[in-house]
């Protein structure tokens, strides 16, 4: 959806009338707002979808005049227009003002200019919008989508509201500076002619400073450089980064020199080694040998203690009888999974079985 017909014309008419007042006060803007009945711009039979789209377009149009290259007065009027449109809209919830992140730095600079110029009514309006969370921060100024058009329509800048690039340079050109220099030289020569001493003019005739032209020239050059830095802040940041790098390199060289001096001092200190006397060496060796003996003795004691613990923890199976061993083996066999092999009968079991069969046959005979 494009800009609704008549909306841009009405906004420009309101801003042009505000420009004619030659003021940035909020009272002057509200008077024009009431006279034009601008609050009824959202009235009419519209569905919710159309209402939301119309409000978005109105806020986007007003935001366009809030950014450069428009004059300071037009930007203040656009701020008041945004405030009025945001608070008189009929959408629920309210549509927010779409702000691209790349434009936010310029907005903060404008806020600081308002505070420095003591335009507190405009600064209050901007702060009120921020507190009401009227801004919707986005990556791009417009909502992007897939388009088949090769050429994208760009908004035209209104020349009436546009801020001149540099008024100082238009006023003081190179021709004007040259003419001022000629006038200044002629003035100095005339003072010498009138004065008694032809080499030096009288002090009574020195109504202006001798370096008047040089001061004007330096001021113009400083203003020109400031204007360039304002247009291209990246160049200024690069210059500052270069200065910081130079300072960092100088600090690194100082650190390297300190480190080298400390290394030299340490090398000198450790190069001179104090040798101990023979008696001390002998004592030291003895002490080392005693330490080794004590360490070996402690190791042997630990080994014997470990052996004793192992002997204590040995199972009492050695004291068990042969039958108990058999029972233990049978218990372990029961724990194991069943196998399909035939059972193995030992000799002792054969003897016991034969004995039981013999006694059983004797009892039968007795009966």
Curated annotation (Swiss-Prot):
Primary localization: nucleus
Chain residue ranges for the region called SNAPC3-binding? 1-168
Record's PANTHER family?
Answer: SMALL NUCLEAR RNA ACTIVATING COMPLEX, POLYPEPTIDE 1, SNRNA-ACTIVATING PROTEIN COMPLEX SUBUNIT 1
Summary of subunit composition and partner proteins: Part of the SNAPc complex composed of 5 subunits: SNAPC1, SNAPC2, SNAPC3, SNAPC4 and SNAPC5. SNAPC1 interacts with SNAPC3, SNAPC4 and TBP.
User: Residue ranges under compositional bias (Polar residues)?
Assistant: 292-301
Q: What is the protein name given in its UniProt record?
A: snRNA-activating protein complex subunit 1
| Phosphoserine carried by residues | 289-290
Where in this protein does the record put region SNAPC4-binding? 164-268
Where would you find this protein in the cell?
Answer: Nucleus
The organism named in the record is Macaca fascicularis
Q: Where is this region: Disordered?
A: 228-254, 278-367
The GO cellular component terms are:
nucleolus; nucleoplasm; snRNA-activating protein complex
The UniProt record lists the keyword GTP-binding: no
BP term (GO), one: snRNA transcription by RNA polymerase II
Molecular functions (GO terms): sequence-specific DNA binding
Q: Which UniProt keywords apply?
A: DNA-binding, Nucleus, Phosphoprotein, Transcription, Transcription regulation
* Compositionally biased residues, Basic and acidic residues: 238-254
Which Pfam family is one of this chain's hits? SNAPC1
Q: Say yes or no: keyword Phosphoprotein present.
A: yes
């Amino acid at each position: 959806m494009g800009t609704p017909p008549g909306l841009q014309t009405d906004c420009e008419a309101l801003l042009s009338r505000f420009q004619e007042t030659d003021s940035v006060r909020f009272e002057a803007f509200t008077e024009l707002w009431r006279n034009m009945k601008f609050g009824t711009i959202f009235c009419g039979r519209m569905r919710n979808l159309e209402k939301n789209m119309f409000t978005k377009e109105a806020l986007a149009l007003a935001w366009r005049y809030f950014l450069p290259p428009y004059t300071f007065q037009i930007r203040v009027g656009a701020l008041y227009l945004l405030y009025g449109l945001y608070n008189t809209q009929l959408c629920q919830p309210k549509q927010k003002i779409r702000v691209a992140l790349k434009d936010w730095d310029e907005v903060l600079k404008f806020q600081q200019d308002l505070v420095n110029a003591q335009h507190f009514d405009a600064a209050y309006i901007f702060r009120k919008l921020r507190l009401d969370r009227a801004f919707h921060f986005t990556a791009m100024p417009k909502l992007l989508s897939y388009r088949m058009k090769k050429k994208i329509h760009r908004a035209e800048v209104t020349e009436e509201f546009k801020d001149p690039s540099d008024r100082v340079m238009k006023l003081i050109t190179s021709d004007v500076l040259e003419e001022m220099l000629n006038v200044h030289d002629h003035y100095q020569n005339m003072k010498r002619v009138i004065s008694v001493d032809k080499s030096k003019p009288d002090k009574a005739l020195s109504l202006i400073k001798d370096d008047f032209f040089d001061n004007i020239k330096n001021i113009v050059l400083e203003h020109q450089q400031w204007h360039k830095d304002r247009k291209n802040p990246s160049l200024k940041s690069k210059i500052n980064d270069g200065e910081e790098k130079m300072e960092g390199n100088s600090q690194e060289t100082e650190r390297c020199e300190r480190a080298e001096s400390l290394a030299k001092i340490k090398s000198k200190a450790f190069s001179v080694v104090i040798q101990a006397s023979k008696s001390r060496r002998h004592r030291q060796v003895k002490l080392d040998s005693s330490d080794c003996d004590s360490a070996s003795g402690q190791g042997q004691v630990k080994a014997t203690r470990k052996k004793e613990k192992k002997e204590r923890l040995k199972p009492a199976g050695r004291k068990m009888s042969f039958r108990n061993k058999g029972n233990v083996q049978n218990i372990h066999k029961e724990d194991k999974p069943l196998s399909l092999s035939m059972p193995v009968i030992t000799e002792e079991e054969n003897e016991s079985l034969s004995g039981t069969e013999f006694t059983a046959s004797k009892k039968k005979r007795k009966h």
